[in-house]
Amino acid sequence: MGKRSLKEWIVRMLTLCVGLTIAHLGVTLFMLTNLGSDPFNVFVQGLNRLTPFSHGITHMCMCFLIILILLFVDRRYIKAGTLVCMLLGGPIIDGFTYLLGDLINESMYLPVRLLIVTAACLILAFGMTIVIQSDAGTGPNDLVAVAISEKLYKPFGMVRVIVDFSFVLIGVLLGGVFGVGTLFCAFLVGTAAGVFMPVSRQIVEWILEKTM
């Protein structure tokens, strides 16, 4: 691949931001139902109980810490999009929580909450694949498994399961919510992402074709 022009970088970064916003809408829906969230946000929920900050600020601080560690491990993992994910991920969650908090909460009927969790899985998976296909960088929390897998020469799938389990275990011990939403996320998001990946690739290619 040749060197990217400034215009292409801007388009890819904007595409990443759209995907990030979609993905974190899914994360917010998980949390508002109080039926459990994705592994990393179970961890963040637990940490958040120990701080006076919002969930979004705690999320941003943890992503910043991961980036600092990666700077010492191997800075090649960090791209411009990684920093964007760190800076915008938390505030996006806080923004959606403010907008939707009065509409979606744990007082809703369980079947409705389960439907919302299912929708959250699909929304998260679609947004995540847009971020990946933008090829502008990956979220810091996703880089944990990538870095460990490559540095220890272990299969990524196995490492990702161990990392996710560790996030959940530590999060629950700190007071994070583990529930059916976490299980839904574990089984549905990956499958849905596999379906969405070629669709998202076509979307990103179409955007680049129309804007270049």
Residue ranges and their predicted role:
Residues 1-212:
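Core subunits and conserved enzymes of cellular information-processing
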